[in-house]
Amino acid sequence: MCSIMGYCSCDVTYDDFKAAFERTKSRGPDDTRVIFTGKGLLGFHRLAIMGLHPEGMQPFELDGSAVVCNGEIYGFERIKQILQQKGYSFQSQSDCEILLPLYKEYGTAMFRMLDAEFALILYDAEEQAFVAARDPIGIRPLYYGYDEKGSIVFASEAKNLVGICGKIMPFPPGHYYKDGEFVCYRDAAEVSSICHDDLETVCKNIREKLIAGIEKRLVADAKVGFLLSGGLDSSLVCAVAQKCSDKPIRTFAIGMSEDAIDLKYAKEVADYIGSEHTEVYMTPEEVISSLETVIALLGTYDITTIRASMGMYLVCKAI
């Protein structure tokens, strides 16, 4: 989780941009960088996961172009090797460093090539224009709006755009923006063919895809931890991850000191798979005192979202 922002014109001062961008500093506490592209500003708050050294800091730049990306590019090593064979060199181990060379080679067709969850803003120096894109499912957040002069502005969270844009809208998943238009490059709901496999084959395929999906998300330079509630979803993820690991994975669970049903079942799962397990206890007082902070971070007063996020916030804070 990082934070990105792009102001696609010179109608904003550096100080005003920085003030708006600072509202999501919590998404990327490790480092911050803002650059002027000549046609606008790009900002990046970093939470280092891949390529932990300073060379992995964004925005990445190439021949005057620049990009900021909040995302994970799966299988980037294979793409990197192909680009190296074409003569490109890389300075870091960051998965996102491949994006500018990839764009230079394939343009907006690159988005269909990515196995990734991402939101990005790219400045194309050759065309002196901005491009933005979001993954097909919309896993990574991205919002946009227009300032009073009609210039488009992109950001990871809506709160970055408050006071700049009169109307703030979610960037459509599976689309890229270029030349004033939003173009769908992949519709996740589109049915290309109807499957008639028997139940056994379907179950086998689901199992294989689940394992593959978990395995590719274990690739990181930073330590990987797992939130375990004891429910079906988190228990399956942790069990598969433990099978893929040659040492105990780190699992974390949270609950109240009384009637902690999640803690009970999480411990049963942790004991069964052999993880290194940590229990975090929260009190009613902690929940109440954290309420305003959680609402501010979420940017919503939706009761269901707030209730579901409270335990997540407190366990992540403890970690």
Predicted regions, residues:
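N-terminal segments that mediate ammonia production and transfer
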Residues: 3-10, 17-29, 66, 76-97, ...
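ATP-dependent adenylate-handling active sites, centered on carboxylate activation for C-N bond formation
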Residues: 8-16, 85, 105, 126-131, ...
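Residue-level signal for inorganic ion chemistry
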Residues: 28, 71, 99, 177, ...
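Short clusters of hydrophobic/aromatic residues that line enzyme substrate/ligand-binding pockets
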Residues: 34, 59-60, 90, 114, ...
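Active-site-proximal beta-strand elements of phosphoester/diester hydrolases
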Residues: 41-46, 66-70, 132-133
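Short Ser/Thr-interspersed hydrophobic loop/turn segments at strand-loop and sheet-helix junctions
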Residues: 43-54, 136
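Acidic loop->beta-strand submotif enriched in PP2C/PPM serine/threonine phosphatases
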Residues: 49-68, 117-121, 163-170, 212, ...
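Catalytic core of PPM/PP2C metal-dependent serine/threonine phosphatase domains
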Residues: 93-127, 136, 314
